[in-house]
A protein has these predicted regions:
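Pocket-flanking alpha-helical
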Residues: 1-3, 83-90, 224
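Short helix-loop capping/hinge motifs at secondary-structure junctions, enriched
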Residues: 28-29, 53, 119-128, 203
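Paired acidic/hydrophobic, glycine-rich loop segments that form the ligand-binding mouth/hinge
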Residues: 75-80
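Long, aromatic- and glycine/proline-rich binding clefts that accommodate carbohydrate-like moieties
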Residues: 93, 146-203
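Extracytoplasmic/periplasmic substrate-recognition and gating elements
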Residues: 89-151
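Short helix-initiation/N-cap motifs at beta->coil->alpha
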Residues: 57-70
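Glycine-centered hinge/linker elements that transmit conformational signals in sensory
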Residues: 1, 31-59
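Extracytoplasmic/periplasmic solute-binding protein
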Residues: 1-32
Length: 228
């Protein structure tokens, strides 16, 4: 940092960071979460200390950290596996890229969602089922993952040499990196609450001298309204 003015690292998604930090502390992000608890404040302070000391940053107006990484103003960042294409584009062969699993036991799984709605006709439901069956075959999952950067949902695809040898930096480590995945509970208000956590953390980390306790108290009140 002192020699090259390069920030150590950061997280693309602050809500992902916050939720995953709490999960590894044994706390689930749901309606029972108390944002003013010691573990919640610890999660915020960990990132805030890094920002203050210059070894962490947030994406901010860059939206994603792949661009700063490509411009060599940040040494590493935690983001979606689907960002590999953007990272390669930003780096443009200027330096060697390396990848590694998330640095914690519990890892959040997020991605593209496909649903079959109850309001659909019988014919539409059958068509949706046939499409999902088609999309989730081993061969199609390899093609889909290669083209999108998302993780295959079928283990046979993940463990296949064909997938591992696609040229993706992530493909060879996916099997080990996805051993302990978790998702947020599917409850009413979850999406709004999750997005609000990103807004709150960004407001804290973007300020020079934030009142963390006050902002977390306000976050608690907002969550209570969301969960109602």
């Amino acid at each position: 940092k002192e020699k090259a003015n390069i920030v150590g690292g950061g997280f693309d998604s602050l809500s992902n960071y916050y939720t995953t930090y709490l999960k590894n502390e044994g706390v689930t992000f749901d309606s029972k979460l108390d944002p003013t608890s010691d573990k919640s404040e610890k999660a915020v302070d960990y990132y805030l200390d890094g920002v203050k000391k210059g070894y962490f940053r947030i994406a901010g107006t860059d939206k994603y950290l792949s661009a700063p990484f490509g411009n060599e103003t940040i040494a590493m960042f935690v983001g979606s596996n689907a960002s590999e294409t953007f990272v390669k584009q930003g780096v443009n062969n200027k330096f060697e890229i390396g990848v590694a699993p998330y640095p914690a036991k519990e890892v959040m799984q997020q991605g593209t969602d496909l649903f079959v709605f109850n309001s659909a006709t019988a014919e539409q439901k059958t068509a949706a089922y046939e499409f999902l069956k088609f999309l989730t075959t081993k061969d199609n999952q390899i093609t889909w993952a290669t083209q999108t950067g998302y993780i295959p949902v079928r283990e046979s695809a993940i463990n296949s040499d064909e997938y591992k040898n696609t040229g993706s930096l992530i493909a060879p480590i996916i099997a080990d990196a996805t051993k302990n995945l978790f998702t947020n509970p599917l409850v009413k208000g979850m999406d709004s609450a999750y997005r609000e956590s990103n807004t709150v953390l960004e407001s804290i980390l973007a300020e020079k001298n934030p009142d963390v306790k006050s902002k977390l108290e306000a976050f608690k009140s907002t969550l209570m309204s969301i969960w109602e």
